[in-house]
């Protein structure tokens, strides 16, 4: 997670972790699902369709719960978004992720990315979440055992090793965020036109 951000976040009131968050719809972006499907298949070539379906369903639900939690959490903060940082994130999105989208859409996504990083930095300190070298090594070893693919590059290259740590930290923070709240599913709303 980004720790050297120019943007800032200030907690303006204590986060109410006993808040019940309403989930009124489940959003599943086909491109998001396909991206995860390909990632799973690249790691586990012999994955059965039922296991793949189960894992993708789990990912979609987790992503939706996390989004609902983050929507609630950002209301407890006041943000000061650095214009140069925002522009840099927007350019990266336009180049690597979103082609042809309107600037206001890209800006909204870029602001969410920056706010998420700021909130994660705050919550990581509050919850004292860390990923040790030993945990990173264990995950890399487990990956080797399951896939039989070479992992030496991740153990020998500090940048790749830290990339694994960052991915694990982000996943842990997503799960911690979800686990700090209660959710109520109210999926009886209207279908979008």
Swiss-Prot record:
Classification lineage: Bacteria, Bacillati, Mycoplasmatota, Mycoplasmoidales, Mycoplasmoidaceae
Coiled coil: none
Organism of this sequence: Mycoplasma pneumoniae (strain ATCC 29342 / M129 / Subtype 1)
Top-level taxon in the UniProt lineage: Bacteria
BP GO annotations: protein folding; protein transport
Matching InterPro entries: MPN555-like (IPR054820), Trigger_fac_C_sf (IPR037041), Trigger_fact/SurA_dom_sf (IPR027304)
Protein name listed in UniProt: Uncharacterized protein MG377 homolog
């Amino acid at each position: 997670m980004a720790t050297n951000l120019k943007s800032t976040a200030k907690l303006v009131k204590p986060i109410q972790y006993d808040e019940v968050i309403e989930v009124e719809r489940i959003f599943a972006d086909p491109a998001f699902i396909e991206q995860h499907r390909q990632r799973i298949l690249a790691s586990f070539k012999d994955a059965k369709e039922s296991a793949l379906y189960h894992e993708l369903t789990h990912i979609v639900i987790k992503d939706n719960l996390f989004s609902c939690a983050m929507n609630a959490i950002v209301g407890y903060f006041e943000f000061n978004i650095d214009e140069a940082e925002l522009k840099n994130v927007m350019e990266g999105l336009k180049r690597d992720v979103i082609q042809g989208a309107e600037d206001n859409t890209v800006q909204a996504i870029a602001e969410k990315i920056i706010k998420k990083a700021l909130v994660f930095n705050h919550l990581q300190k509050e919850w004292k979440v860390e990923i040790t070298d030993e945990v990173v090594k264990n995950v890399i070893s487990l990956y080797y055992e399951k896939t039989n693919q070479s992992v030496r590059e991740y153990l020998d290259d500090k940048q790749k090793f830290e990339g694994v740590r960052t991915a694990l930290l982000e996943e842990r923070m997503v799960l911690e965020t979800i686990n700090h709240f209660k959710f109520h599913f109210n999926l009886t709303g209207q279908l979008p036109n």
